[in-house]
Amino acid sequence: MRVLSGIQPTGRPHWGNYFGAIRQYIDLQEDNEGFYFIADLHALTTVREPEVLRENVMNAALDLLALGLDPSKANLFVQSDIPEVTELTWLLMTGTPMGLLERCHAFKEKKAKGLTADAGLFTYPVLMAADILAYDSQIVPVGVDQVQHIEVCRDLAGSFHHAFGETFVLPKAKTLDVGAKVPGTDGQKMSKSYNNTLPLFGEVKKIRKQIMRIVTDSRPMEDPKDPTDDHLFQLYQLFAGPAEVETMAAKYRAGGFGYGEIKKAVAEVSEEYFAPARAKREELESDLDTVRDILAEGAKRAREVAASVVDRARRNCGLR
């Protein structure tokens, strides 16, 4: 099966990004043909500084490769290196109803807040559909709140088929594990919007300080506690093995257990868990030419597939 996933280069990944999405879709490279792209064209709707965008794109590539994306198993490339995608966007846009775009979440939310939504945001779902259809993608891993994008993609492909005949592979959404929601430093869902994230990469000492400042309740140390209702324990579970998790749960239930101990434990297991990725990233940072070669090779393969798909679309709609 062919899997497609994109990551926006708009900021550095945090624990929630990793466990809620990145790890899950990287795992799909083992038994599928993976196409993973860095969505720099999409990022232009929010990132307007050229140097920042260039830096973000390279950081996204370094992050994905360090976290386990294997270029011998999957194709990693930059969205703007595939001009066929922007051409396909136009072919799809000529048959896209305005009402469909007006109903899409991102546009509706921005409009509801009284913010100005530009044409880039308005037509964002069409570019996303082109991203998916250009590679004959069969599986697209998404969060529950992103399923609408796949539905829109299928609708646009269906409209094109109705007008010009069968052309595209219709993708299916693979919903990511909703149980993989990661609590932030304040106990809410980890999100940049809440300013409660813990980064995957960065100074270990600084991250440890952030962990030690995680908000807890004011229950006395001697009181027994329910581990399943505690966000520090939920973080610990992400990294520790079954035996370690059970031992920690028993300490919670027994009482006489301070939050300082679990904070130190979270810091230790998370540092150990991400240590190989941090080492890999440092290695890649010292050899950026290799990273560029990986992106170029991924783009070469992606263009071969996209060119074939767009050629079908051109012929079917009368441009060839």
Curated annotation (Swiss-Prot):
CDD domains: TrpRS_core. GO terms for biological process: tryptophanyl-tRNA aminoacylation. Keywords: Aminoacyl-tRNA synthetase, ATP-binding, Cytoplasm, Ligase, Nucleotide-binding, Protein biosynthesis. It is an enzyme of class 6 (ligase). GO terms for molecular function: ATP binding; tryptophan-tRNA ligase activity. ATP binds at residues 8-10, 16-17, 143-145, 182, 189-193. Its EC number is 6.1.1.2. It catalyses: tRNA(Trp) + L-tryptophan + ATP = L-tryptophyl-tRNA(Trp) + AMP + diphosphate + H(+). A motif ('HIGH' region) lies at residues 9-17. InterPro entries: aa-tRNA-synth_Ic, Rossmann-like_a/b/a_fold, Trp-tRNA-ligase, Trp-tRNA-ligase_bac-type, Trp-tRNA_synthetase. L-tryptophan binds at residue 131. It is found in: Cytoplasm. One of its GO terms (cellular component) is cytosol. A motif ('KMSKS' region) lies at residues 189-193. Belongs to the class-I aminoacyl-tRNA synthetase family. Homodimer. Catalyzes the attachment of tryptophan to tRNA(Trp). NCBIfam families: trpS (TIGR00233). This is Tryptophan--tRNA ligase. It comes from Rhodopirellula baltica (strain DSM 10527 / NCIMB 13988 / SH1). The gene is trpS.
